[in-house]
Amino acid sequence: MSWRSDHICIELIAGSRKPSNVCWAFILFLGSLGFLLVGTSSYLGRNFIPFFPSQQIIFFPQGIVMSFYGIAGLFISSYLWCTISWNVGSGYDRFDIKEGIVCIFRWGFPGKNRRIFLRFLMKDIQSIRIEVKEGIYARRVLYMEIRGQGSIPLTRTDENLTLREIEQKAAELAYFLRVPIEVF
């Protein structure tokens, strides 16, 4: 989603609060909870899961391994739930022609550097660069080349834009900023 006027362009960036991330975190939580329950029920000799008798799984080595997988899965799912609740990676890109300033803001992980805020002068922007890698894992990323700073990605690597969409986005931004487009 973006907003544009004659002098300002604001592009909102979606973070980790995506339906696919919530789905994976939920599936991982339920699966790891199941593994932990099976491992615990094999240790205690009780049936915590009614449709799965605990006598079929002995604690050593299957119960220990399932408990370990359950605990590891709970740690990974809690990490996913934390990134979803903190909305890591979300933010905005603001291009202000009137003041000649580009501001890039992203939310990070909690701590000293939670707010990532970059400011550049528009005259330092050399070009808008499109990087395309085709194959099994196709990747199309839009970069902004800054003089003396290198490239800054403007799209997420997992955004999976089509070639037409990335070209359209690059053309609109290059036209707004009055800079050339490079393709790699």
Curated annotation (Swiss-Prot):
Keywords: Chloroplast, Membrane, Photosynthesis, Plastid, Thylakoid, Transmembrane, Transmembrane helix. It is found in: Plastid, Chloroplast thylakoid membrane. The keyword Membrane applies. One of its GO terms (biological process) is photosynthesis. The chain crosses the membrane at residues 22-42, 57-77. Seems to be required for the assembly of the photosystem I complex. HAMAP family: Ycf4. Belongs to the Ycf4 family. This is Photosystem I assembly protein Ycf4. It comes from Morus indica (Mulberry).
